[in-house]
Amino acid sequence: MNQLIVATGNAHKVEEFDGLLETSGFEVCSAKVCGGMPYVLEDGDTFGANARIKALALRALAPKDAWIVSDDSGLEVDALGGAPGIHSARYAGEGASDLHNLNKLLLELEEQPASQRAARFRCVLCLIDPSGREQFFDGACEGRIAKAPEGAAGFGYDPVFVPEGHSESFAELGESIKSKLSHRALAILAMRRCLES
């Protein structure tokens, strides 16, 4: 069975990959099999570039016959020219909390009507096979930014992101619905289709 190592220290992310790649012929492992995820400076200017940086950093430590996958993701708001984008986790500055990032976003959109609040969560995966070939897979969940936070579940921008076709935020919809709409899940499923073809 092929080994697929997920370049992250986040156990929940590894579980998401494992669940969606079940029966794919890949054994999904965390970066722990390589001694842990090394520190990397994510200084790329796109989600794909940052995903590639992480994948290459782990590949240097991984067994030569392993497949490596990494992701980078964030929120893109059309009225803000795609921001916060690759800066989603630190939108209000280095070390900013989720609440600070969310409040900065709402402040910047304060004057925007509902029709101008289109947004999406985007995820880009970088997959490196044992030969070193790189492939990228994109997943996006379209929606809009609400005027105020709603719901207590989730994290980050979940309380203000209302996915297309729904009237409740990700934080109100709950994990089971969110996981079906997830930008990461869509990217993983695109990768799985490629691996199985």
Give short role names for the model-derived ranges.
Residues 2-5, 11-197:
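Anionic-ligand binding patches
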